[in-house]
């Protein structure tokens, strides 16, 4: 019986570091998004290195890194990650990959604008934000390639991906 108790306790302690790491990763991405938002809103001075570093933080923590942070057996309590991630693994993985591609394009925008936010980085007036999960638009048309989008639009799509992922895969907690 003592051997059984030791065996059942092991997975719990093995999961805790994964949960802590992914929570730290999500916080780092949220902080990076606040930096980018502050730059676009004019609350922070434009600094191409800070802009790029923030976009790179999101890029490095999305894609495969994000997928690896949600292994089977680490979902549910004590984290807010829903077990539904496992049932919808393909969708979750695709969303993590989409986020990575958007963040990579956003990062490269800083290389093209070393001195300040350019008009090309800004969303055009009336530019539609109607993208849905994974860039699929109503009627089946896909969004433009991320490398062709203004940086501000990329950033809004990143935030939309975060919102979509949290709405589906994150348990609301008080």
Summary of predicted features, one role per range:
Residues 42-51:
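Short, surface-exposed loop/turn segments at secondary-structure junctions
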Residues 1-4:
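Bacterial N-terminal signal peptides
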């Amino acid at each position: 019986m003592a051997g059984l108790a030791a065996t059942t306790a092991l997975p719990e302690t093995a999961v805790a570091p994964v949960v802590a790491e992914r929570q730290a990763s999500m916080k780092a991405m949220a902080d990076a998004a606040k930096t980018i938002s502050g730059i676009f809103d004019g609350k922070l001075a434009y600094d191409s290195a800070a802009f790029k570093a923030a976009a790179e933080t999101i890029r490095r923590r999305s894609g495969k890194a994000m997928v690896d942070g949600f292994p089977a057996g680490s979902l549910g309590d004590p984290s807010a990650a829903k077990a539904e991630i496992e049932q919808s693994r393909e969708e979750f993985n695709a969303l993590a990959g989409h986020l990575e591609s958007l963040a990579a394009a956003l990062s490269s925008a800083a290389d093209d604008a070393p001195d300040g936010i350019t008009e090309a980085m800004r969303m055009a007036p009336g530019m539609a934000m109607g993208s849905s999960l994974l860039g699929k638009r109503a009627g089946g048309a896909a969004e433009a390639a991320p490398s062709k989008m203004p940086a501000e639009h990329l950033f809004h799509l990143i935030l939309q991906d975060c919102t979509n992922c949290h709405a589906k895969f994150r348990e609301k907690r008080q």
